[in-house]
Amino acid sequence: MTLVKQINRKRFLASFLFVFLSFGGYCQRYLTDIDSSFFIKDTVRPVLKRFENLRISGYMQPQFQVAATDGAPSFEGGNFAQFSKSRFMLRRARLKIDYLLTSKEKFPKALFTFQIDATERGVIVRDMFIRLFETKKNNLSMTAGFFARPFGFEVNLGSSSRESPERGRMSQILMPGERDLGVMFSFEPQNKTQKLNHVKLDAGFFNGQGASGTTDFDSHKDFISRFILKPYTINKKIEIGGGISLLLGGWKNGTKYVYESGKNASGDKIFVVDSSVHNFGRSSPRHYYGADMQVKLHSGWGETEWRAEYWFGTQPGTATSTANPGTIPTANGIPLPTYVRHYNGAYFYFLQNIVDTKHQLIIKYDWYDPNEKVKKKEIGKAGTNLTAAEIKFYTIGLGYMYNFNTQTKLIFYYDIVKNESTNLAGFLDDNKDNIFTCRLQFRF
C-alpha cells in the first residue's frame, strides 16, 4: 500500500469516526420517527460530504437480574432457567442504519431504515422498511416493510428512551416484538409552521403475526390506526399529549370448534363451544381499542410526568394461551380449537426528576386481565374448563435512573408481580416472581 493510500484511509476513518460520534446526543424517541440528527445545522456535515445522507446509531443494554425464586417466570427479559434465580444478560444490542434523501427545501423525500439486534441469544432483524414522502405539501408519507405497528404509546416508545426496563405484560403478549410486515399511510406535516403540525395520523394493513412468524398463515389482514396529539404546550409549565388507537383484525380458525364465555347448568362460568361447520376457516375477531395521555409539568424542583394508557377488546387464543401466534396453533400437527376472550389492561407512569435531569424516580403500575368475564376463585373451579390463561396479573415497578450524560444511564428497578388467587394448582396464592434489574445503557 502506498503512503498516499495509507494517508487517505486514515483520513477516511478519522472523518467517519468523527461523524459517527458527533451525533451521539441525538436519538429517535419513537420507533418510526425520523432521526433528528439528519437535520443538524451544517456544523458537522462539511467534514465528510459522502455521509451527509447516512446515519448510524445504536445502543447496548447489559444488565444483571435477581429473581425471588429459581426458574421464575418473567416478562423482564424472559423466564429464568430452571435452577437459576440470577443472571447477567445482554438485553439488547442494536445497530441501526438510516439513509435519508431530502428535497431542495430540506424536507424528507425518502427514508430507508435497517436495524439488527445482536445478543448472546442470536442476531435478528428489528426493522427493515422504506418510507416515501409526498413533496408537494410535505404532509403525507407511505411506509412499507417490517416496522412498528401504529398502536399505543408504550409499544411505540423506543426501548432506549423508555424509563422502565421492559414494556408491560399486555404489550408483550398482544404485540410481541412490536413490529409486523405491512404498509402504512401517514399524515404528518413536516413544515413546523403548518397549522396541523402537532397532530399525526397513521393507518395501515399488516399480516398480523408480527415477528413470531415468517409469513402470513392466512389471508386475513389487520387494519391498525392511531391518531396522535403531539406534546402541546398549554403554558410555559405544562405540556399535554395523547392518542387513540384501533386494531381490527383476526386469524383463521383451524377447526370448527370456537369457544366463548358462558355458563353451565349450575350457573358456573365456563367456555361454551360453538361447533358449527361454518366456523372452519372463518376469522375469529381480534379487535383492540386504546387511548393514552401524557402530561408533563416543568418546575424549579424538577420535571414531573404522568402517563396513562388503557386497552380493551377481543382476543382469540387457545385453551392455555392468549398470545398472538406465528402459525395456526396445533398440537402434534392437529389444529387446536379457538377460544375467544374479552380483555382489558392499562399502564400508569409517574416520573419525577430530582432537582435536575441526572436523577429520576420511576413508579409504574400496569395490569393485564386476559378474560374480564371471570375472576379469582372462579378460575379452576371443579366442573369448569377455565385455565391459567384467564388469570389477571398486575405489576408495580419502582425504579431510580441516573443519567451520566445524554448517552449513558444506569437504572435500578424492582418489579413486584401479583397474580389473582385461584383454584388452579400453582396459582392458589400469589407466586414469588418479583424481579430486580440493574441495567447500564449506552447509546450513540
List the predicted regions and their residue ranges.
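N-terminal secretory signal peptides that target proteins for export/translocation
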Residues: 1-9
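N-terminal periplasmic/intermembrane-space "pro-region" immediately following the signal or transit peptide
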Residues: 2-3, 23-63, 69-71
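Bacterial N-terminal signal peptides
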Residues: 14-24
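Outer-membrane beta-barrel pore domains
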Residues: 30-32, 69, 81-82, 238-248, ...
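Outer membrane beta-barrel
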Residues: 45-68, 76, 80-211, 216-224, ...
